[in-house]
Amino acid sequence: MKGSIFTLFLFSVLLAISEVRSKESVRLCGLEYIRTVIYICASSRWRRHLEGIPQAQQAETGNSFQLPHKREFSEENPAQNLPKVDASGEDRLWGGQMPTEELWKSKKHSVMSRQDLQTLCCTDGCSMTDLSALC
């Protein structure tokens, strides 16, 4: 009798724990995963952006959108518009940085961890905190 009551109690505790975990973590695969990450990252960016702007300026800007000016192009001297090449013959970006190949090598670890997180979210589930870490 005591064994069956203990087993029933243990089963109910395990069921409660699994329900709590399912609320904390969500299984997301494919497009659901991508949409959720975009939603989480975009909403946090908009919040941070709006927190940094005074309210009077928010009302003033409305729906206007301006592109940042990365580099001015010269119509008079088209040679200035070409990318810079150093003595070794390798392209350099505007800020003196190496092309995307070097950037990919440096970001390889973070890309792998993002792929691991995507796999984990699909198989076991992940929390919204885990997903917001990608932003």
Swiss-Prot record:
Where is the secretion signal located? Answer: 1-22
Q: What is its main location?
A: secreted
- GO molecular function terms attached to this record: G protein-coupled receptor binding; hormone activity
Q: Where in the cell is it found?
A: Secreted
Spell out the disulfide connections. Answer: C29-C122, C41-C135, C121-C126
Quote the cellular component terms of the Gene Ontology held in the record: extracellular region
Q: Which UniProt keywords apply?
A: Cleavage on pair of basic residues, Disulfide bond, Hormone, Secreted, Signal
Query: Might you name a Gene Ontology BP term for this protein?
Result: positive regulation of feeding behavior
Propeptide cleavage-removed residue intervals: 49-114
Stored InterPro entries:
Insulin-like (IPR016179), Insulin-like_neuro_ligands (IPR051777), Insulin-like_sf (IPR036438), Insulin_CS (IPR022353)
Pfam families annotated for this entry? Insulin
Q: Which domain of life is it from?
A: Eukaryota
- What function does the entry list? May have a role in gut contractility or in thymic development and regulation. Activates RXFP4 with high potency and appears to be the endogenous ligand for this receptor.
Family indicated by similarity:
Belongs to the insulin family.
Oligomer status and interactors: Heterodimer of a B chain and an A chain linked by two disulfide bonds.
Q: What is this protein called?
A: Insulin-like peptide INSL5
